[in-house]
A protein has these predicted regions:
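Bacterial Sec-dependent N-terminal signal peptides
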Residues: 1-26, 186
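Structural microenvironment flanking redox-active thiols in thiol-disulfide oxidoreductases
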Residues: 88-126, 137-146
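Thiol/disulfide oxidoreductase modules built on the thioredoxin-like
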Residues: 126-128, 135-184
């Protein structure tokens, strides 16, 4: 009997740490979208920072300057046609464009495609209707990517009417929440 008691106590001492670890991981919250910003958005420009101007050509070769959109909210969607996460987010960004574009919010896609035809095909395939610009340089070589501290795509910035960063994130749901806070009359 004493041996059985000793064995049970030893087993309890051995099993206790494993049970505690199992309970701790069961109590831990599942990975959240906030974790993505903590992982990929830590170096992005902070809210209140002046948004660097973007002067690039549109997909049809016309000049574009971000400063021309002063006085409006602007959503800058940094993406590329070869990026699976960008393609996954694209329909949601289009929904936001259709909803908030009607309120005067400008949407601008900043592509890191290197090839004009690939870029055009990506825009057509995804059905993107808002303004698209690019310097046709890879993200690591693009002055725009450097100015906006882009290290991961998709990355989305919201620029306020005064030309300041209002939001910088890799989570499209945060863009939706922010725009809904600015335009509460738009139903979720």
């Amino acid at each position: 009997m004493k041996t059985l008691k000793t064995m049970l106590m030893a087993l309890a001492f051995i099993a206790a740490p494993a049970a505690i670890r199992a309970q701790a991981s069961a109590d831990a919250p599942a990975a959240t979208v906030t974790d993505l910003d903590q992982k990929y958005a830590t170096d992005l420009l902070k809210a209140g920072t002046d948004a660097p101007d973007i002067t690039l050509n549109t997909i049809d070769g016309k000049p574009f300057a971000l400063k021309d959109l002063r006085g409006r909210y602007v959503v800058l969607d940094f993406w590329a046609s070869w990026c699976p996460d960008c393609r996954k987010d694209s329909p949601f960004i289009m929904q936001l464009y259709k909803k908030f574009g009607a309120k005067g919010v400008a949407f601008v896609g900043v592509s890191f495609d290197k090839n004009l035809e690939s870029w055009k095909n990506g825009v057509a395939k995804l059905g993107i209707e808002y303004t698209q610009v690019s310097d046709l340089k890879p993200m690591r070589e693009s002055p725009v990517a450097k100015a906006y501290h882009i290290g991961w795509i998709p990355t989305i910035y919201v620029i306020d009417p005064q030309g300041k960063v209002a939001l910088a994130t890799v989570v499209s749901d945060k863009v939706s929440a922010y725009l809904h806070s600015v335009y509460p009359d738009c139903a979720e």
